[in-house]
Amino acid sequence: MRSIKISERLKEKWGKAALGCIECQVQVKPSSQELREKLDEIITQLQESLVIEEIKTQPAIAQTRACCKALGKDVKRYRNSAEALYRRVLQGKGIYYINNIVEVNSLISLTTGYSTGTYDLSQVKGDICWDVAEEGVHYPGIRKAPVNIGHLPALRDEESFFGNPNSDSERTCVTEDTHHILMCIYGFDGAEPLKNILEKTAEALQKYCKASDMEISIKD
């Protein structure tokens, strides 16, 4: 597995930071009907059981917000990806269907409340560190303008920052040419809750993305 560590700066600011990691080979393609139906089922369940005002109190979302706030980020203006996905679903806007990898990200976020990110390892340069981005740091977002990642717990390689619980960079995004990925589950309540989630994520990657050569670890 690619070398991944958590910076002392992040650990000092949020001691319960833990990163669930799955590295594997995959086949990127449009999502199957089975995966789409599974997502539709989960979306219906959420719409029947939650209201928008309750999203920020969901345990994993609340922990992500608490960490980002502790690092100095305005969590009302900059929502984490799981929170934003929940809001979109409860507003009846559905989700964006991009490819099976992106949809597995959505599946895991919607069933757990954890923010996730998946990265094309062929575009990641060298070792990875989960760190706190400094004030004023930006990177080109995926199909969007530059993203302000200052004061966020963000992944960086030997070139620059490329991912965080809010929004990922265009540089390392998954495309139809991607074969080797790193999927990360951003945890802020210690390693223990990630164990079961990683198991379910691995099953989903194998079922929907034909994942192979899989390595799983938790960095805390």
Describe these PLM feature segments.
Residues M1-D220:
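Charge-biased, low-complexity intrinsically disordered regions
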